[in-house]
Structures are given as structure tokens and as C-alpha cells.
A protein has these predicted regions:
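Short, mixed-charge, low-aromatic patches
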Residues: 3-5, 30-31, 41-43, 59
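Short, surface-exposed ligand-recognition loops at beta-strand->loop->(often short) alpha-helix junctions
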Residues: 15-28
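Intrinsically disordered, low-complexity segments
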Residues: 2, 11-12, 19
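An amphipathic, aromatic/His-enriched active-site/gating alpha helix that lines ligand/cofactor pockets
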Residues: 27-42, 64-101
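Glycine-rich beta-strand-turn "strand-cap" elements at beta-sheet edges
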Residues: 1-7, 46-57, 83-118
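Short, well-ordered beta-strand segments in beta-rich or mixed alpha/beta enzyme
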Residues: 8-15, 44-78
Length: 118
């Protein structure tokens, strides 16, 4: 891949019970984060939490990718479908069917620099 091709941000969001935040973060570190970082072409990931003030917390996962082919290696052929894990039903209040993909047009995290050095 040429480093001038657009990088891709994959975004997924849902909600959990606020009381489950610590357990959910620990669970995701051992499932989703390991899978993201173990997939060739993944450039990193983050999980964001936002307390909604009603006993629920919004969870957003952002992951950065070199290409749609890299995402396909992580997500399967239907890259638009959300990927779930065995214990997700224990935590998630809703399970959206789809994720969002965005082309990164301005990047200040050093992702391109990492690609150029590899």
C-alpha cells in the first residue's frame, strides 16, 4: 500500500450499564483490543466512554486501519457488520448491526509516519 492512500477509521458505538464500566473495559482489553492489535494492517485502537447520566454509558471504539483489506482480515467479508464476542450480551444494552468507516484526510497521530518507517 502506498502511504498516500487514505487511512481508514472504523467506528463502533453502543451503550452499557455505568456500573459495568470497569468490568467491560477489562473484558474488551482481552478480546477486541487483542484482536485489533493482532491483525496486520491495524494501526491502533481506542475505547471511549461517555456517562449519559441515566445509568448508562456510551461506549465508542475507534480503530485505525491501513486498508479495507486489513479491515476484512479483522471483520470478515461483510466489513460493514459489527463484530461481537461471546460475552457481549452480558454487557451491551444494544447491539448495532453496523459500524462506520471514515477516510482520514487530516491526520496528526503519526500513523503515516509509522507506515513510512515500517
Amino acid at each position: 500500500m502506498s502511504v498516500t492512500e487514505p487511512l481508514i477509521l472504523r467506528r463502533w458505538s453502543s451503550r452499557i450499564r455505568t456500573e459495568d464500566c470497569e468490568a467491560y473495559v477489562s473484558y474488551i482489553r482481552g478480546t477486541g483490543v487483542e484482536d485489533y492489535l493482532g491483525t496486520p494492517g491495524n494501526l491502533g485502537c481506542e475505547m471511549l466512554l461517555r456517562d449519559c447520566g441515566d445509568g448508562s454509558t456510551e461506549v465508542s471504539t475507534l480503530s485505525w486501519w491501513q486498508s479495507m483489506e486489513s479491515i476484512r482480515a479483522f471483520a470478515g467479508d461483510d466489513v460493514e457488520r459489527a463484530r461481537y464476542y461471546r460475552e457481549d450480551d452480558r454487557f451491551l444494552l444494544e447491539k448495532p448491526d453496523h459500524v462506520e468507516h471514515h477516510h482520514i484526510v487530516v491526520e496528526g497521530l503519526g500513523l503515516r509516519r509509522k507506515l513510512e518507517q515500517s
